[in-house]
Amino acid sequence: FMLRGFFYTNLNYKGENMERALKKYFVIFALPTLIAFAISFLIPFFLGIYLSFTEFTTVTNSTWVGFENYKKAFVGNPDFLNALWFTLKFTVVSVISINLIAFIFALLLTRGLKGTNIFRTVFFMPNLIGGIVLGYIWQIIINGVLLNFGVDITFSAKYGFWGLVVLMNWQLAGYMMIIYIAGIQNISSDLKEAAQIDGANSFQTLMNVTIPMVMPSITICTFLTLTNSFKLFDQNFALTGGAPAKQTAMLALDIYNTFYGRIGFEGVGQAKAVVFFIMVALIAFVQLYITRRKEVES
C-alpha cells in the first residue's frame, strides 16, 4: 500500500513538473506561429488601414490626406454604389438558391437511393475547380447559348447577373450539400419515428424535426455562401469583367479596377477595401448571431 502511494505521489510530482515546464516554454513554442501571423496578417492589415488615409504610389511614398479617399469612394462615384447594389442583390439570390438546392439534394441523397456515393462525388467536384477557370468555362457555355439569339453575356447586365448566379450555384451547391448530408445523418431515427407515431406527415416531420435539428449545418452553410458570394472576384473577373459598362462589376472587382486601373487612386482603392472588409465582417457577424439564436431556440 505504501509502495503504491509512493508511486502515485511520484507520478503526480512528475506531472506537475511537466505542466510547469510547458507553461514556462509555451511562449517559445508559440512564437514562430505568432510571428508568421503578424507578418502575413496583422502588419498588412494595419498598414492597409493607414494607407487608406493617404495618397500613395508605393508604401514608402505616401502623403496623409485624412478622410479624402473615403469621400472620393462614395461621393460622385456611381461605380462603387452600383457595385454595392449589384453585390447585395447577387448575394441575396445566391445564398437562398444555393442553400435551397443543396438542402433538397441532401434530402434526396439520404433516402437510401442506389448510387448515392457517386452522386455525392459528382455534385462535389465543381468545388475543386478554380474560380478563374470556372468563369471562362461558363462564359463559353453561356455565350454558346446566347449567340443563337444574336447576343452574348456582356450584352445586358441581367445576363451577367444570372450567369454569375448559375455559376455560383454550380460551384457551391455540392459542397453545401455534403454539410447538409452530415447534419441530416446525425438526426436520431427515434425522433422521426416519434413524429410519425404522433401522426406527422412528411412535410410536418421536415419542418418540425429535420430543419430544427440541422440548424448548425444551416448556420455553417449560410455563413459560407454569404461570405463567398459577397467577396466574389475570380468568377466575376473571368465571366463578365464587369461588362457592360461596369454594370456587372461586384465590389471586389470595383476595388481592383480602382486600385490598378486609375493612376493616383491607389488610396481610394484602399479606402474601398477597408469599407468592404467592415461590411463583410458586420454582415457575417449579424448572420451568425441570428442563426445561432435559432439553434438555441430549436
Regions found by a protein language model. Give the residues of each.
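Short, Lys/Arg-enriched N-terminal segments with co-localized hydrophobic residues
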Residues: 1-17
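A structural signal for multi-pass alpha-helical bundles of membrane permease subunits
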Residues: 19-298
